Regions:
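A beta-strand signature from Gram-negative outer-membrane beta-barrel systems
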Residues: 36, 137-181
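Short acidic/polar hinge/loop motifs at secondary-structure boundaries
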Residues: 104, 122-150, 170, 264-266, ...
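Extracytoplasmic beta-strand/coil segments of soluble accessory domains associated
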Residues: 78-122
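Short strand-turn segments of transmembrane beta-barrel domains in outer membranes
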Residues: 150, 165-200, 210-222, 679
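C-terminal beta-signal and adjacent terminal beta-strands/loops
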Residues: 4, 530, 576, 581-582, ...
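Acidic/polar loop-and-plug regions of large Gram-negative outer-membrane beta-barrel proteins
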Residues: 236, 243-321, 348-379, 431-434
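Gram-negative outer-membrane beta-barrel transporters
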Residues: 400, 461-465, 568-570, 575-580, ...
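N-terminal periplasmic "start-of-domain" segments of outer-membrane beta-barrel proteins
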Residues: 37-72, 103, 126, 148
Length: 764
């Protein structure tokens, strides 16, 4: 594979800088080493390495354990990203639990272009069908921190999903003392949550913990409920200066859906048959009586698909990980890891009688054993699969060099089916007749075999005032899909096997951080990335086997920034330019090598983004050390660079990417053991389609919490605490998650209304 001139230039410049600054003539006498530790103190103040990413060559910030534990109980680690600069997080509910209601964008990238890791285990793709979205795999109570790089994660972090952004979730090690914690929460919409964790203590180098959480509540919008059972465990065996760690996660989740709606439905101008409008627009909690549209078929009216029991999701996920860390001599460190994941689940969606009848007639003479539709059809999708992999990393400290190299291997096998079945009496409330299939839509398997390795050298120069990172990674993903990908495959009696390989053997990353003095740093970085095409199964299921597969999306990321660390404040500001090529888009075109026109996914050009991000915290002396402030501000312009088909979108803004994002808060500690926080988050208006003919208004949300009892104990409990969380204090009515379109009105998920939650916890 050829190396671009840009890559050559970046590496040559990096090498030249390294050689020049490493020469004896540049060995300036300096007393400074690294930037001093943060002096600002407080129970909700982060150390500089967390708050502003001190000593990092890229813009890297984190969410502390204290912040995670101050959030509403049960909130997902994904939703917590909304407190970080640049991350536009939208959620269907206050806790971010509903999978199909979550969305994330940062700089030029969306949720599926971000890499996620849990204790250095790569989480693969974030697809709700078949993926491993991070919010299924960890409770906040077990997290130590969440670290995010909005532009470019470290070259040594394994991911085939990331075009630059990386979010890493790090859990706690087991406590060396026997003990535990129990908490119970009640909240709006009949929410109940219990969390319990037991630490076993250390015994001859062995330690461990087990935890469980149980959530049940009603949907805030419409009928139905959510139910989640989640278990985690970790065992650690310290061997000399090394350790072996085993961890496991088990997640069982069930919920009912709520609909996405258009602006017209939201405004009540869409002529809804049931008079629904506003943010409470929901599925029906009853089976209505509707006119018959097909003679003799009682439930033939399409509007019967609005009954809530026809929209269901269920997932079960199991993850096991084993890690071995050990020093080798005085200069080498080895880390080996292995993991295994299994998953299964199903989703239910309705299909109207007329649609089912057409599909049934298309297949009934070809596929034996089909039944004529009786009314509204029960649409069942099932998923199952396994994912397994190994990682290895070796670091070597050699004078001014910190060398590291590693490899990642993974196999991901996934199976999906989709069929339509009759229900008793054809009724929306009838039991599904799984022995009466009406028509078949999917039954395929897909595999992803990944090989990635990296090499990195961190040089410490100028009396350790300058650190330079030089590295690259190689990524190869072999993809295959086979079976019945769509109804056309069933009708044509074909089971195609389609393969595609995406690889790049040289993806460089260059970065530097310079200590101006003991309080200030300048940093800069450049990186290139390649990612598995997002939604690969959908891409290769969209058309006939003759349609060619697309090239992988690729990206470049530039950053330059400054950090300041003072006795009463710290701050970081970064400017960036980000772009990705080979953007994927489905549209009608002639299939190469034929005269047939089909709608299939193609590479259609680039997206570029530029902007700046600020993050800081301040504890003013004149307020007696009892009040401190934090704030993040982001400015981002993300634009399409190329037109596609007949759509002139070059220069148009990418939908769902706000120009301005701001979060800020004030924390007040009036007395020891009491903490009050008031925060706000503002998102500016967003375009909702590619041609920028529609946009949704910006909004501001205010949240607050009160923590009481820090340091208070009684009886067998070392600490007893109470917390109150109020989200969306002013009950802001807004449209949050956007399902973007090309040139038509988009659909939205209204943001959740005001919620209140009370939590009582005890540690022993």
């Amino acid at each position: 594979m050829k190396t671009s001139n840009l890559r050559r230039g970046a590496l040559m410049c990096g090498a030249a800088v390294t050689m020049a600054l490493g020469a004896p003539t540049w060995a300036l006498a300096q007393t400074a080493g690294t930037v001093d530790e943060l002096v600002v103190t407080g129970s909700r103040v982060s150390e500089a390495s967390v708050a502003i990413g001190t000593d990092q060559a890229t813009a890297t910030v984190a969410i502390t354990r204290e912040a995670l534990l101050s959030a509403p109980a049960g909130v997902t680690g994904l939703k917590m990203l909304e407190s970080l600069p640049g991350f536009n997080v939208q959620a269907n509910d206050a806790l971010g639990m509903y999978e199909f209601g979550n969305s994330v964008s940062v700089r030029a990238f969306n949720f599926q272009q971000i890499g996620f890791l849990l204790d250095n285990i790569p989480m693969g793709r974030s697809d709700q069908f078949g993926g491993s979205p991070i919010y299924r795999y960890v409770d906040n109570e077990n997290l130590l921190r969440v670290t995010a790089s909005a532009g470019s994660g470290d070259v040594g972090l394994p991911s085939y999903a990331s075009l630059g952004p990386i979010v890493s979730y790090l859990t706690q090690v087991p406590d060396k003392e026997f003990g535990g914690v129990v908490s119970y929460s009640r909240g709006s919409d009949n929410l109940q949550r219990t969390f319990a964790r037991l630490d076993l203590g250390e015994h001859n180098g062995f330690s461990g913990y087990v935890s469980g959480s149980w959530i049940h509540g009603d949907l805030w919008r419409g009928p139905g409920d959510i139910d989640r059972k989640h278990y985690e465990g970790k065992l650690r065996w310290e061997i000399g200066e090394g350790a072996i760690t085993f961890q496991t996660v088990h997640n069982d989740y069930f919920d009912y859906d709520s609909p996405s709606i258009t602006k017209a439905q939201y405004a009540g101008t869409a002529g809804d048959l049931f008079g629904r409008s506003g943010r409470d627009f929901a599925y029906l909690g009853y089976v209505p009586v509707l006119p018959v549209t097909s003679p003799g078929i009682t439930y033939s009216n399409t509007a019967y698909n609005q009954y809530y029991k026809q929209a269901v999701n269920s997932r079960q996920d199991h993850l096991y990980g084993l890690t071995y860390e050990t020093p080798i001599g005085g200069a080498l460190n080895l880390t080996l890891g292995g993991y295994y994941e299994s998953k299964e689940g199903y989703g239910v969606s309705p299909e109207a009688y007329a649609t089912s009848l057409t599909n049934y007639n298309n297949e009934r003479l070809i596929i034996p054993g089909l039944f004529a539709p009786k009314g509204l059809q029960y649409g069942l999708s099932t998923v199952d699969g396994t994912r397994q992999g190994v990682t290895a990393k070796l670091t070597w400290n050699l004078g001014v060099h910190a060398l590291s190299a590693g490899v990642w291997l993974e196999n991901d096998d996934y199976h999906r089916t989709q069929q339509r079945y009759n229900q008793v009496g054809g009724s929306p409330d009838g039991a599904p007749l799984l022995n009466e299939p009406v028509h078949l839509q999917r039954n395929y398997t897909s595999t992803r075999d990944t090989v990635e390795f990296f090499v990195k050298d961190t040089l410490s120069l100028l009396d350790e005032r300058l650190h330079i990172d030089l590295g690259f990674k190689s990524l190869s993903v072999d993809y295959n899909i086979q079976g019945y990908r769509n109804p056309a495959d069933f009708i044509a009696s074909r089971r195609p096997s389609i393969s595609k390989t995406w690889e790049d053997n040289f993806l460089p990353q260059v970065g530097a951080v310079f200590d101006v003095n003991s309080r200030d740093q300048i940093f800069a970085s450049y990186s290139e990335n390649m990612a598995l095409p997002r939604g690969a199964d959908d891409i290769f299921s969209a058309a006939s086997p003759a349609a060619p597969g697309p090239e992988a999306e690729t990206s470049t990321n530039w950053e330059i920034g400054y950090r300041a660390n003072r006795p009463t404040f710290n701050a970081s500001i970064v400017a960036y330019q980000t772009s990705f090529e080979n953007r994927l888009q489905a549209f009608a075109a002639v299939v190469p090598g034929s005269s047939t026109t089909e709608t299939f996914y193609q590479n259609v050009g680039a997206v570029k983004a530029h902007g700046a991000e600020f993050s800081g915290q301040w504890k003013p002396e004149f307020l007696g050390g009892k009040v401190y402030f934090n704030s993040n501000l982001s400015y981002n312009i993300a634009e399409f660079q190329d037109n596609f088909a007949t759509f002139a979108i070059a220069g148009k803004r990418v939908p769902d990417f706000p120009e301005w994002l701001w979060t800020g808060g004030v924390t007040f500690e009036p007395v020891e053991g009491a903490v009050f926080n008031l925060s706000a988050r503002h998102i500016s208006s967003r375009f909702t389609n590619f041609v920028n003919s529609e946009e949704t208004d910006g909004y501001t949300i205010y949240n607050a919490y009160l923590d009481l009892g820090d340091g208070f104990g009684a009886g067998p409990f070392e600490q007893i605490k109470a917390r109150v969380n109020v989200d969306n204090i002013l009950d802001e009515d807004y449209l949050g998650t956007v399902s973007t379109t090309t040139n038509t009105p988009a659909s939205f998920r209204p943001g959740p209304r005001r919620t209140i939650q009370f939590t009582l916890s005890a540690e022993f």
